[in-house]
Amino acid sequence: MRLLLFNQNAFLLACMFVSSVYVNAVLDAYAIENPYISITLTSLLAPLSMLAFLKTPRNSAFALGFFVGALLFYWCALSFRYSDFTYLLPLIIVLIALVYGVLFYLLLYFENPYFRLLSFLGSSFIHPFGFDWLVPDSFFSYSVFRVDKLSLGLVFLACIFLSTKPLKKYRIIGVLLLLGALDFNGFKTSDLKKVGNIELVSTKTPQDLKFDSSYLNDIENNILKEIKLAQSKQKTLIVFPETAYPIALENSPFKAKLEDLSDNIAILIGTLRTQGYNLYNSSFLFSKESVQIADKVILAPFGETMPLPEFLQKPLEKLFFGESTYLYRNAPHFSDFTLDDFTFRPLICYEGTSKPAYSNSPSKIFIVMSNNAWFSPSIEPTLQRTLLKYYARRYDKIILHSANFSTSYILSPSLLGDILFRKRS
């Protein structure tokens, strides 16, 4: 019997499943910014993820999940390049793939198309080890379809009728279902004037230099240079990426410089904060009125926290995070910043792609700060933007994103209207 792991059909189905993500990654790589190209390709390819999910036989379900896990999340292992455990990189990719192999085996256990419909819609609620980046709904972020569960359910039903029902009347029903899922308001652009005077910084600080103390002076000079440039453009707020200042800012003389400069321009910067023996991944907002601080609430699994039982957690923290007394801790709740009459929620990298940050928030505007140097080059920035766009459309939010080693941008809650800021040379 042929090994399921090397099932060629399962690999092709996995490629169908992730095709919309990879096509957008290619568009990003070649800086193709015409939105209609992305919308057209995504609208055609995103339903293929449903078709692959629908058509995979149960005996290929594990193989499908294995390949999907590897294709979508191989980049998680790339952070090991900056550790003493580089040799574990292939093993980590295989372990990730195995987890999603098991998950897809369960999701596709029954071949009934209506069971597959429910399991597809429910898959975004299942987060292995707290990692919530498998959101198939987000594949439709740049499509002409609405991204709520009901609309995606209609698209899945259309796939059922168009692929399994031979009679013409069922084909007509399938087309009508697709029409019912269209977002007829999607081509209306949202008003982004309120965020038009914000400078989003894209930095290019290599990860292997970021925490090198000998490089700190260059980082400080680059920050000051960006602030002065934003002042010359008469911007009211400048946003830097996650850990743009890579040591505890509260204990640094550099904090006083930022406080002085904030008399003329507000400064939002990602940095670290210590409290006792606790280490926080934080954002600081400097303005002429005050300094506001928000700590990260949702920590990245295996990067900042070990989502494992305590008897495994402690030795693994010691192994991978070292003997340091300091360990990452999270804030108990999200915070919103107020700047004059402008209120927004700051989010740091991983938590910016998590549903809890958006679902119960009164804020209309979100500012996400990321350090994507850990995973460069990879599809991670594209997958991140796909998720952020999904939450922007799903919850009617404006999302601003400042990143290290990837594009910074403003995402509109409508299909059109995004503004991308390419990395500076």
From Swiss-Prot:
Report the active site residues: E242, K296, C349
Q: Which residues form a coiled coil?
A: none
Pathway(s) where this gene product acts: Protein modification; lipoprotein biosynthesis (N-acyl transfer)
Q: Looking at the UniProt record for this protein, which Gene Ontology cellular component terms does it annotate, in alphabetical order?
A: plasma membrane
| MF GO annotations | N-acyltransferase activity
What keywords is this UniProt entry annotated with? Acyltransferase, Cell inner membrane, Cell membrane, Membrane, Transferase, Transmembrane, Transmembrane helix
Superkingdom is Bacteria
Instruction: List the HAMAP family hit by this protein, alphabetically.
Output: Lnt
Functional note: Catalyzes the phospholipid dependent N-acylation of the N-terminal cysteine of apolipoprotein, the last step in lipoprotein maturation.
Recorded family membership: Belongs to the CN hydrolase family. Apolipoprotein N-acyltransferase subfamily.
Q: Tell me the protein's name.
A: Apolipoprotein N-acyltransferase
